[in-house]
Amino acid sequence: MILGIDPGPELSAYAMVELDYFLHGSDKINTKLLISLINTHTPQHIVIESIQSYGMMVGRSTFDTCYSIGRILQVCDQLSIPVSLYPRPEYARRICGVGKVNDSVLRQALLLRFGGDKKGEPLHELKGSSDKRSAYAVAVYHLDLLHNGRRDK
């Protein structure tokens, strides 16, 4: 199982994804609960949307997000869980096939590839949450790399 994470300063979204892209579960929780989830489920691999510099000034929330990522990396190191970090432009470009991607374009690409988000459909659990969709998307990107022989499991 792959755990995709879209980190935030207070709450982080996660998506538990099987190797066949099946969405096993997702939520948006605080870092302490996310670390508890990692300890409980011990995923095969964790993929995190990384922070990327665009040469602009950033605020406190960006640094708080970096601290959250650091806490997650620390627990992964302690549990010997491999981690990959991917910036949003990298994974979004691959999934959507275009250079500049916003939340609605990413949502549409995921719906076209994996099915709808109405009740009973594959992506229903992600409906209404761009953060959970991003967590799923970063996991999908990593799985695409795995299936194309570009990364270790």
Give the positions of each predicted feature.
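Phosphate- and other anionic-substrate recognition elements at nucleic-acid/protein interfaces
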Residues: M1-K153
